[in-house]
Amino acid sequence: MALTKLSLVLFLCFLGLYSETVKSQNCGCAPNLCCSQFGYCGSTDAYCGTGCRSGPCRSPGGTPSPPGGGSVGSIVTQAFFNGIINQAGGGCAGKNFYTRDSFINAANTFPNFANSVTRREIATMFAHFTHETGHFCYIEEINGASRDYCDENNRQYPCAPGKGYFGRGPIQLSWNYNYGACGQSLNLNLLGQPELVSSNPTVAFRTGLWFWMNSVRPVLNQGFGATIRAINGMECNGGNSGAVNARIRYYRDYCGQLGVDPGPNLSC
């Protein structure tokens, strides 16, 4: 009888441990757990190795999984991306340009980003992408071609004849010195061919990520307001309260969707 009771206790303990590891069939796992090829949540190689569907997947050797299987791919799901771009009108040029796959491909060319990004950072980034492009409607700045973004005093990245350096891509890369520095970093001739940003969606997202890593990520720990200032400081201090409030609304929305707290210091 005592042996039977002991067996029952051990069995119940096993069930408790099992339920702690396997949260639900077909996944919906916590952020730190992998969804296995069979649709269960866990953290061992059986879950995070071969066939891993989402979460912090890794190859059988213990390294991060290929594009789409790592943390950035598990956060920026197709459903999350579609929830944004589907709000753009049917006639928007960006609707047939920007894709979730092009973002993931671009992100994986920045391993320091792809392997360390958090849900709050994605909420921050896509709030700005949404605002800058109108839910991925616009590839280029409205009336941008009529505006002069050539700093003739910048001799390191001189303007090419007949080329315009107006806003393009998800972060609206602007000015010759930004096109020049970005192109140099990405090994692309963006100074001579700025139109590459508006003709190749992966290049477009790569330019956004370049600007992000150099100008925005360093201030993330200061709050969302600091990222607004990094992208368009003219909106701050009452410069354009409507734009600031719109960015904050998007940010709060995406934090809610991704299950993270927005944190303090949202405005600038």
From Swiss-Prot:
Reaction equations catalysed: Random endo-hydrolysis of N-acetyl-beta-D-glucosaminide (1->4)-beta-linkages in chitin and chitodextrins
All copies of domain Chitin-binding type-1, residue ranges: 25-59
Entry similarity comment: Belongs to the glycosyl hydrolase 19 family. Chitinase class I subfamily.
Active site: E132 (proton donor)
Protein name per its UniProtKB record: Basic endochitinase CHB4
Principal location class: secreted
Enzyme Commission number: 3.2.1.14
GO molecular function, one term: endochitinase activity
Cysteines paired by S-S bonds: C27-C35, C29-C41, C34-C48, C52-C57, C92-C137, C150-C159, C236-C268
Glycosylation sites (chain numbering): N265
SUPFAM superfamilies, A to Z: Lysozyme-like (SSF53955), Plant lectins/antimicrobial peptides (SSF57016)
Uppermost EC category: hydrolase
One Pfam family, short name: Chitin_bind_1
Chain residue ranges for the region called Catalytic: 71-268
Induction behaviour: By infection with the fungal pathogen Phoma lingam.
Coiled coil, from the record: none
Record's function text: Defense against chitin-containing fungal pathogens.
InterPro entries the UniProt entry points to: Chitin-bd_1, Chitin-binding_1_CS, Endochitinase-like_sf, Glyco_hydro_19, Glyco_hydro_19_cat, Lysozyme-like_dom_sf
Signal peptide: 1-24
GO cellular component: extracellular region
Localization: Secreted, Extracellular space
